[in-house]
Amino acid sequence: MNLGEILSSVKLPRPLAPELAQTEVTGLAYDSRRVTPGVLFFAFPGSKADGREFAADALARGAVAVISESLAPPDLAARWIQVEHGRHALALAARTFFGRPDERLGLTGITGTNGKTTTAYLTDSVLRAAGGVTAMIGTIEYHLAGRVLKAVNTTPESLDLLQIFSDLLRAGGTHVTMEVSSHALALGRVHGLNFHTAVFTNLTRDHLDFHGDMERYFAAKQMLFEGAGGNPPRFAVLNTDDEYSRRLRLHARTERLWYGMTPEADLRPRHIVSSFKGLRFDLQFRKQRFTIESPLIGKINVYNILAACATGFSYGLAPEVVARGIASLKAVPGRFERVDEGQPFVVVVDYAHTDDALRNVIAVARGLNPRRVITLFGCGGDRDRAKRPLMGKAAAEASDFVVLTSDNPRSEDPLTIMNDALVGIRRTDVAHVVEPDREAAIRRAIKEAREGDIVILAGKGHETYQVLKDKTIDFDDRAVAREVLKGYGYHQTQ
């Protein structure tokens, strides 16, 4: 494919020189280290480095041209193509280069603050129950037709995303379910893609260090339902109990499927039974009613299940297929995940890292009628500082005992982060301890537990690392908790 063909959908300020337009392109790259002769290099600013600084290196490695928002340096002008939006150009060029694979796949995008990951796992399970050959892309990992790949971002860069789509098609793939983060929408990583179904879970405070305020955060989420540079989705799956869902602007051609607890919802649960064994309820879908059973714990997961069911219906799946897919998902890593060594109390690990998510996970625990709830949490560094006291207050108001510790401090002083959260805790009279060493904090939380208690280790969930100021270390809340329990003499026997 030549350069002119690859850039045919990209708006250029001036036509390409005929000789340049006819140049054959063998691949695309946004990292100069991946450039080989014949590759087209896209140079745009990243979070840690600016690709424009590596343009000369890319050309020296054999790049056919450089695509950038910036004016061309005089010495590179002959092979420099200026565009209005570098990431949009990459997304559109990659889509052309890989033959528009999104048009040949059932593409579902799931956005919102909480519940994206669980909803994605459930949706993927439903589609596989229908016989689909699927990919799932999200926070924990990427699944590609039975293979598991490490997740770099919740939503990959557009080039990597389209490569996954292309690989899936070659493997006989039919559907992709993906978490679509607000960062990905704002940065154009899904620009130009055609989604069959767009799902909105909810919107609460998060990522304001990036977006600035809630309206900008919401505006980023809105982009998925407007088409994000492609056609608007055929279906929008919306939470009738979330105020931001009701504010979304939708294209007239987009069919709405509402889910929630209110009578006007298209999908509504009846007779919910929640226990340590999971969930069971009757699902009312318009004039149909059938039973849903799931091993997932907690009424908050009813919303995630409803969203996944609605997505299945958007693809025309039968209720019995949808129900089978929901029942077959046994657990989601790091989402109310139990650590069981036969102890007389419950220990769970959960990814909750906002005040709303903390309230939700503690509410799930309360719904299981424990003697006490002991909550361990921390706040991430280099993120929205204003949410820290809100998280402290949420944990303190809903728990019987709180252990405040470090999360991923990144470049910040862990004690400064903890002091911010402590402001919220001290607005209550809850018993609490402060322990900056996360391993020692987990030991303290478990030591506090007695028969009938639930210990929640919140914030890191599935993560197997901790990001410190000058390094990243191996750290898994689940593994640490298991070793602590064994150290106290507990050991699960089969």
Swiss-Prot record:
Q: Where is this motif: Meso-diaminopimelate recognition motif?
A: 407-410
Q: Which GO terms describe its cellular component?
A: cytoplasm
Provide a GO biological process annotation: cell division
Pfam families in the cross-refs: Mur_ligase, Mur_ligase_C, Mur_ligase_M
Please state the Enzyme Commission number of this protein. 6.3.2.13
Q: Which UniProt keywords apply?
A: ATP-binding, Cell cycle, Cell division, Cell shape, Cell wall biogenesis/degradation, Cytoplasm, Ligase, Magnesium, Nucleotide-binding, Peptidoglycan synthesis
Reaction(s) catalysed by this chain, per the record, are: UDP-N-acetyl-alpha-D-muramoyl-L-alanyl-D-glutamate + meso-2,6-diaminopimelate + ATP = UDP-N-acetyl-alpha-D-muramoyl-L-alanyl-gamma-D-glutamyl-meso-2,6-diaminopimelate + ADP + phosphate + H(+)
Tell me the residue numbers annotated for binding meso-2,6-diaminopimelate: R383, D407, N408, P409, R410, G459, E463
Q: What SUPFAM superfamilies does UniProt report for this protein, alphabetically?
A: MurD-like peptide ligases, catalytic domain (SSF53623), MurD-like peptide ligases, peptide-binding domain (SSF53244), MurE/MurF N-terminal domain (SSF63418)
Q: Which residues bind UDP-N-acetyl-alpha-D-muramoyl-L-alanyl-D-glutamate?
A: S32, N153, T154, T155, S181, R189
- Which GO MF terms does the UniProt record name? ATP binding; magnesium ion binding; UDP-N-acetylmuramoylalanyl-D-glutamate-2,6-diaminopimelate ligase activity
Cofactor annotation: Mg(2+)
Sequence positions that bind ATP = G112, T113, N114, G115, K116, T117, T118
What pathway is this protein a component of?
Cell wall biogenesis; peptidoglycan biosynthesis
Question: NCBIfam families annotated for this entry?
Answer: murE, PRK00139.1-2, PRK00139.1-4
| Listed PANTHER family | MUR LIGASE FAMILY MEMBER, UDP-N-ACETYLMURAMOYL-L-ALANYL-D-GLUTAMATE--2,6-DIAMINOPIMELATE LIGASE MURE HOMOLOG, CHLOROPLASTIC
> What protein name applies here?
UDP-N-acetylmuramoyl-L-alanyl-D-glutamate--2,6-diaminopimelate ligase
Species in which this protein is naturally found: Solibacter usitatus (strain Ellin6076)
